[in-house]
Amino acid sequence: MLAKRIIPCLDVDNGRVVKGVQFVDIKDAGDPVEVARRYNEQGADEITFLDITATHHGRETTYDMVERIAETVFVPLTVGGGVRKIEDIRNLLNAGADKVAINSAAVFTPEFVAEAAAKFGSQCIVVAIDAKQVEDVEGQPRWEIFTHGGRKPTGLDAVAWAVKMAELGAGELLVTSMDGDGTKKGYDLALMKAITSAVNVPVIASGGVGNLQHLADGVLEGGADAVLAASIFHFGEYSIAEAKQFMAKQGIEMRL
């Protein structure tokens, strides 16, 4: 069995790491290079860097910052935000990213995912899915994909979309519950389970971690291959090492 991964996430806005609640109400959490260095030293399995306003403002991800982070850390680095063209992916990989996350562009042009996977290999293409719980016509809960940092509904069903993205060549899915984001109430385990049981590519759970049990639940109940968190690490509540030891005690295979 592959070890499960802990991935601290750097949401970057105007050159600073920030953290919001449900994609708004933003707090400053430091300099991206310093924050990344700290997580590298703490034993993070990977680091994710998301330029959270790049798509909204139509701005390219800051390549120089990606270069500086890549020089600082020695674990896989996933970078996303404003990725719209093959050239964007090439530039990010050249800057030192190991994987590139595609979000809004996948919704507008699904074939872009297939093209990217064909050109660079599925192993470095991550599709980021931001989902919010809505009710269908019968009043049953389902999850809908939102784009532009959670601002725009798409009408797309999140589980069906996840299946489609995996079929098109995404090597990994980063699934964020927008209802949970920053709330510290835990992952949306029903959403995670629905997606992890429907696809055969690794799924990263994101959105809502408030304690170490939430991380473990993402794996044990949500079926996630990796767990992503921000606030609990950024503001010093827990270290990566504490998180790994806690999860290992629950029988989850971790790289300690």
UniProtKB/Swiss-Prot annotation:
The active site annotation covers D11, D130
Give the EC number(s) under which this enzyme is classified: 4.3.2.10
Q: Which domain of life is it from?
A: Bacteria
Q: Name one GO biological process term.
A: L-histidine biosynthetic process
Q: Which pathway does this chain act in?
A: Amino-acid biosynthesis; L-histidine biosynthesis; L-histidine from 5-phospho-alpha-D-ribose 1-diphosphate: step 5/9
Q: Which compartments does it reside in?
A: Cytoplasm
Q: What is this protein called?
A: Imidazole glycerol phosphate synthase subunit HisF
